[in-house]
Amino acid sequence: SYPMKLVSLDSSRFAMVWTDANTYYVKVVVGTVSGSSITFGSTVVVESYNASGYVEIDKVAANKIVITYMTWGGPGGTGLPKLSVGTISGSSISMGSAITWPYVTNGNKLEAVSYNSTEDKILVVAPGTDNATNRAKFVAAGTVSGNNITFGSLVQISTQAEEGYYFKAVYDSTTN
């Protein structure tokens, strides 16, 4: 089975994303907590083509999320990292079209996504871009506008991460 990821939207709602182990579709749903009960809106398919299983999610605003995932079938049968922006209204969610990660990743997944509300940017952590740097880690800042994301340059943040270890991104508002 594949891990589910959750993000809090407000004091009573959250979004949950996962890859369905039977269909290999990436799916998302909004949950609402009331007392000790949880109700869910309709499940929405984010990606219906051969997803790899590992997903990340973060909130961009009270009504907007970004999901990262990967599909198989890129060049040479490698993975193709993708992102999708979703807009939430109550317990409903509407997903934009898939955005292909604009940099080569050697078929590796995007490892983390985090939103910086002060700068109004998302940060995405990605693996190396070629065989020489495939264990190095990089980060790129992106601007979300509607259902689109525009990315700046990749910046290397480590040179030799061990295989099997993944980075997480968290914004700290107390530092620059």
Language-model segment annotations:
Residues 1-176:
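Extracellular, repeat-based ectodomains that mediate carbohydrate processing or recognition
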